[in-house]
C-alpha cells in the first residue's frame, strides 16, 4: 500500500471520530503534533508522518518532472472541457514555437516537445500571441511559486482527503493553491503543468483585478504561459 493510500484510509477513520476527538485530531494535524495520547492523537501522528513522507518522496522525484506528461494533461483537458473546439485538441506550431491551450491555461514553448498529439492541419490554428500580450504587461506582485515537489505533495495529500470522503470522481474538487492575501488563487493541477513545462519560471500577477486577470509565467529560453485564476468571491472556479 502506498503512502497516499494509507493516508486516505487514515482520513476515512478520522471522519468517524466523535466531534471532540475529531477537533483534537484536526488541531494536532494542523500544528504537526506527535505523541498526543489517545486514539485521535495517534491518528494525527500517523497523518503527520504520512504527509511528511509524501513530501519527501516528491522532493526526491521533482528533478524528473515530465514536461511531456504536463503537455499531454493540457491536451487531455482540452478534449474534456473544449469538446467542440477541435483546434485545441493537440499541440500546434505558430511562428516556429509550439502552442498548447485548454481555455484555462496556455503555453508557448520555444522548442517543441516531441510525441504530442497534433491539431489537424486542416483546422485553423489559434494564435496565442495576442492572448498572451495583455498578461506580458502585468506589473503586479511577483508570486512566490512552490517547487514541483512541494506542489505534487500538496496535491496528493489533498486528493487523499477528497477520496476519503467517498466522493465520486466528478465531485472531487482540485487543490486550490492560494498565493496569499489579496493575491490570486489557482487550480493546483494547472499550476503544476506550468511549473513542469516552464522550469525555473517567474510568475507575475496583474495589478488590476488580479483575481480575474491572467497570471503571466516566463522561463527564459524555454517559453511563456498564462494561467487564469479562480473566482474567490463566488466560490466558483474558472479553472
Residue ranges of each PLM-predicted region?
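Short, charge/polar-rich alpha-helical segments
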Residues: 1-13
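Intrinsically disordered, low-complexity linker/loop segments enriched in Gly/Pro
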Residues: 52-109
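Short interaction-hotspot residues at assembly and binding interfaces
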Residues: 15-52
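Flexible loop/turn and low-complexity linker elements, especially glycine-anchored beta turns
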Residues: 4-6, 39-65
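C-terminal functional regions that serve as terminal interaction/effector modules
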Residues: 102-105, 109-113, 117-239
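Intrinsic-disorder/low-complexity loop/linker signature
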Residues: 31-32, 90, 96, 222
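Exposed alpha-helical structural elements
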Residues: 5, 66-74, 150, 190
